[in-house]
Amino acid sequence: MAAHCNRVPVIDGHTACVSLEFDLPADKKPSLEEIEKIWTSFTALPQKLQLPSAPVQPIIVRHEENRPQPRRDRENDKGMAVTIGRLRSCPVFDIRFVALSHNTKRGAALGGILNAELLKAQGFFDNL
């Protein structure tokens, strides 16, 4: 995997350009369609528990050539969803894509609240 973030003058939102290679034989590597299906159907424990701060859809896939963009996509699902776009085959690795998350919501404030909600739901505070 290779990834890089660029510092750009935006108010909120971190964008990562990711290239990755699967450690699988060529005939076992997922297609772009399979990868997108995995992303769009992904749910985790916060969604299963329907926690208040959890995004309904934690990963949103965009098909436009110029997305994701911080100004347009950072607030997806209250700022808690990760938006992925520009998924394509990579001549060096297997695939590449751009991912965007809201740094002050998903990455800090609401992310911390979601962690606390998850700990409470799992009974972490019951014996304190």
Region locations from a protein language model:
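Generic C-terminus detector
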Residues: 94-128
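C-terminal substrate-binding/catalytic lobe of Rossmann-fold NAD(P)-dependent oxidoreductases
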Residues: 1-94
